[in-house]
């Protein structure tokens, strides 16, 4: 292998296209990640960190370039194919021809196993199927059919894969740990395992019966390239004697600082000579070694600082080196070499139009001849038609209407044709439904004209503009078509500092807190607002925080924490993330399909229906009676067809809260408060209409009533028109439902005609109503003025509820109850059919002792008029859940948590998730009763988090990134230190939070959390459940402690707790307005002259550093030199680039 020489061509930068101006502020690394030769054409392919694939000819001239992977995911592997090029990213597989036209594109949305992919290879000669594998053990090894573009097979593989290579019979799998498995793709199993390298495999090649590998081993704690390459013979399944490849630092020149012999980093079997292997190191030295006679070799040195990739052409005559900074350079055997492959295909290029004269004369009026065929002369001066914008003074006008007889005739003809179409359809089996004005709004209405100047002003207006904010909070519609801005579906916008850049204050000027939309199932926010201002519900839920209930995940406890946080926040934004996390851990909620962002109408579940499918149908099934298929379908269609996800969740939530209260009071004689508040005692009576005469009665209790349209078989409402009826007949009819069905009798076990009657026997203080009406029924209801009654009177007469608008209409001597509308949830449907929920709540103003109505649209909170709140006539507004309260209950005061005798014992003892273990490592000292914290007690805090999901990004055509949804993070570790006293700086809480979810990234460099630290089976840390730590944190907040830390605002947001500013001492005090924020590490260097965070982060160290910084701040503030000292810190920081030097 002599006569190799460096190519005469200068190295070429393959990342030139990534150095465009619009990418210069992108912090993403710009580099080439993979280089391969084309096996069918004289091309070399390069994939980069932005997901783009480029091809170059032997002169480095660009042939094609295309974006292969959405989201600018880096290319991790490339394979040349007879029909094009195959590229792989971590979550997608892309196949295109050589001209860059996509032939197949598969993402994780198409094949779920496409996750954290690292490598791929063919395993057949026809190249029709490809194997892919990577670092996600859950994905295993997948086989993709390139012809069909589908997943062919999937094989479970327990190890992380780094390299794969095939000899078209077997596949060699290089595992991340350094060993090798031989995989048979026919039987989909590993047939043999080979020992490899002690640390990892860096390169591997497999041809015929020869397998060669290069790897790394640990030497004195550092990874060093092995000085031997491993050779295997797969015929005998054994390793042959390794071949030495060792270069001294002096051999490769002075550009390396290594003190150890240099080993092999890259290798490839020669494509023409089967016993020759090309081996190279990252320093640039490379050899051609004969495996039969290893002493026969030819050493070379590539002149560069370092190389990142090394590959041989299919002809064996070219060597490509990818140098530092993505520069490509080549070696060849002689200057006469013509191409990368021996039988190169002819490349296709685009056609160029010929500038020729028109062969015949074209008339000006000839409409069939395209004007684009007439070329324009070349020019070098500014054309006369290029007038400046200052010439045009008009703002733009509307085109004048063309008047004439022709237009009217056309209108008449079109009207006649439409009438003929309508008559034709009406005579057929299909018919057109009349246009629903109340659902879709008026049509054929011309929008008012807005000049370009007005539009321009609207586009450039900012959220700081008071007028714009006023428009944003406008809740009254200007016409019957447009939806007011206050009802728009809100989206959070994330800036450089995440959600901290978002101005929530512009959406809420009240004292009542809204909720962020940065959670799953955003519709849950409105259900929380629905019950937040019901005094009896609030008082009971918050009172449950008085005692410890941390054994299991409790919806009742989490709702109490959330209600208390929203009260304490006093209008500041809050999150319901912890509440949603607890709901997601409940299997029943998942089975009901509650975790979705789609809130449209659902038709129920297959199989046995549950309570949410209607009062009567669920009760029949509770009696274990068999109903035939026809009857079951009729019941589902009648009672569960228009049930929405929010209504299902409302029923689930109330039932869950009641069941948790019952469980807590199993050994107590106390009354079940929520049952008394919401419980409807329902009697279901079933009478068989035959000689059998079977009669069954079963009482039961429901927490929420499904309100349907009055039944046609109800004598009381059969002759009344609903066009002048309020909601009261709907409620009263739903409290007494009657149905006749054919079902199997439980006594004679025969199909008999049966009567089913479901009757409510009581009137609880709170009525939770799920309004389930059809679109046609809503059309009728919206025409009734005052359909949603503000109040009504009710009584029980003859064991049946009677509801009237006036008390004088109830001619009875029984007790009469007045109910007032407390709150309700409405569904808003925009012009594009997208739906979201808003909540209306009636709240008592303590200053003037009058009730006011407020509208909650997630984090937008606005006071509105009562008439507007009760108006449901708009086509875009539909009530779903309504809460009526007894007039006496609504006037009860809200009880503050501060008046409760809260149990604080958990602050003085351990509560591990798996009990007290002997091998647990404690780095803290528990508080004693003598150290009981009180108002003003300083507590230093730092929290660490792990990432559960990746962020969702949107990238436009210019490469600008927009964060749509940040990565979901979970609390991993929290350390709290004493901030004063004899034990100042000593931790009293150092909790690791157990995590049972999939962790996408441990963020070890920033969190100090290692894999296994949060696993109760493996960890030796003090593991606790999140509920345990949260109660400790909540208790310290209630006791009035003052928290000291760095970046506490973000920590408290992720912990999901609101701490008033008066109880926060953040090291952000070291900040000059208009300047950059200083990191904790740099502040420790600049102020304390100490180094922190030298390795992984440690929350105890970070909390203690923040405490010392705060003490220093108080000292400087007392001397009156803090501002001058801070300016010196910034001046010094500019010299170091705000980075900590290696030595202090």
Curated annotation (Swiss-Prot):
Location of the protein in the cell: Cytoplasm
UniProt EC number: 3.1.13.4
A molecular-function term among this protein's GO annotations: poly(A)-specific ribonuclease activity
EC main group: hydrolase
Start and end residues of each Exonuclease domain: 939-1110
WD repeat feature ranges: 27-66, 153-193, 196-233, 302-341
GO terms for biological process, alphabetical: mRNA processing; nuclear-transcribed mRNA poly(A) tail shortening
Cofactor: binding comment: Binds 2 metal cations per subunit in the catalytic exonuclease domain.
PROSITE patterns (UniProt xref): USP_3
Sites where the protein binds a divalent metal cation: 942, 944, 1051, 1102
Source organism, top-level taxon: Eukaryota
Pfam families membership: PAN2_N, RNase_T, UCH_1
Cofactor: a divalent metal cation
Region (Linker): 344-481
InterPro entries the record matches: Exonuclease_RNaseT/DNA_pol3, PAN2, PAN2-PAN3_catalytic_subunit, PAN2_N, PAN2_UCH_dom, Papain-like_cys_pep_sf, RNaseH-like_sf, RNaseH_sf
Catalyses which reaction(s): Exonucleolytic cleavage of poly(A) to 5'-AMP
One of the record's GO cellular component terms: PAN complex
Quaternary data: Forms a heterotrimer with an asymmetric homodimer of the regulatory subunit PAN3 to form the poly(A)-nuclease (PAN) deadenylation complex.
Described purpose of this protein according to its UniProt entry: Catalytic subunit of the poly(A)-nuclease (PAN) deadenylation complex, one of two cytoplasmic mRNA deadenylases involved in mRNA turnover. PAN specifically shortens poly(A) tails of RNA and the activity is stimulated by poly(A)-binding protein PAB1. PAN deadenylation is followed by rapid degradation of the shortened mRNA tails by the CCR4-NOT complex. Deadenylated mRNAs are then degraded by two alternative mechanisms, namely exosome-mediated 3'-5' exonucleolytic degradation, or deadenylation-dependent mRNA decaping and subsequent 5'-3' exonucleolytic degradation by XRN1.
HAMAP family cross-referenced by the UniProt entry: PAN2
Domain remarks: Contains a pseudo-UCH domain. This ubiquitin C-terminal hydrolase (UCH)-like or ubiquitin specific protease (USP)-like domain is predicted to be catalytically inactive because it lacks the active site catalytic triad characteristic of thiol proteases, with residues at the equivalent structural positions that are incompatible with catalysis, and it cannot bind ubiquitin. It functions as a structural scaffold for intra- and intermolecular interactions in the complex. The linker, or PAN3 interaction domain (PID), between the WD40 repeats and the pseudo-UCH domain mediates interaction with PAN3.
Family: Belongs to the peptidase C19 family. PAN2 subfamily.
Protein name: PAN2-PAN3 deadenylation complex catalytic subunit PAN2
Species this chain originates from: Kluyveromyces lactis (strain ATCC 8585 / CBS 2359 / DSM 70799 / NBRC 1267 / NRRL Y-1140 / WM37)
Gene designation per UniProt: PAN2
